[in-house]
Design a protein with these regions (language model features):
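Sec-dependent N-terminal signal peptides
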Residues: 1-4
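C-terminal motif of bacterial Sec signal peptides marking the signal peptidase cleavage site
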Residues: 8-11
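N-terminal, intrinsically disordered, polar/charged segments of Gram-positive cell-envelope systems
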Residues: 16-55
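A short beta-strand segment in extracellular, disulfide-stabilized domains
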Residues: 91-93
Length: 169
């Protein structure tokens, strides 16, 4: 396992910080749940349904949501664009240390990482084009990590600078 590296994003927050465990009205799409991570491909991650809100602990900031923890068992996590009709704008306090986690697709509304870290079991992470700075995120095991993003984006530049495999979407 290789050492860690650090990254972060400029973000915004809300005013009302109500801590919640999500009670999702969504049904977990059984076809989207993958149990054998040895069979997962990057295309599986790209085509995977959003992870149900019930799999996350989050803070309601009033006009937005910050994800605190992932409690699901699916090795693929697709951060939802919204929870309870509010944009998911940040990941805080290292919620992605779940040992079953292999693949993460970050939502396009995501603006901030606050001391977030990803376990050494993570194999693929999709960084949307809007991500332009990673300063407060730690990846462990980056020698086995693949960053997926737009060609010519910050994600590609970052991957090359850090010696991480990059795949254009």
């Amino acid at each position: 396992m290789s050492g860690a590296f650090v990254m972060g994003l400029v973000g915004c927050g809300g005013t009302d910080s109500s801590d919640k465990s999500a009670e999702s009205k969504e049904n977990n799409n059984s076809e989207a749940f993958v149990t054998d991570s040895a069979e997962i491909t990057v295309d599986d991650v790209r085509n995977h349904a959003e992870t149900p809100a019930s799999d996350f602990e989050y803070i309601d900031n009033g006009d937005s949501v910050s994800i605190k923890a992932y409690n699901g068992s699916d090795p693929i996590v697709v951060i939802p664009e919204q929870i309870d009709g509010k944009d998911v704008i940040s990941i805080i306090n290292g919620p992605f240390s779940n040992d079953s986690l292999k693949y993460v697709d970050l939502g396009y509304n995501l603006k901030e990482f606050d001391d977030a870290y990803f376990s050494d079991t993570l194999e693929v992470i999709h960084l949307p084009a809007r991500v332009e700075n990673l300063d407060k995120v730690v990846f462990f095991g980056e020698d086995t990590l693949t960053i997926v993003g737009k060609a010519g984006s910050f994600a590609e530049t970052f991957a090359k600078e850090e010696g991480i495999k990059f795949e254009a979407e």
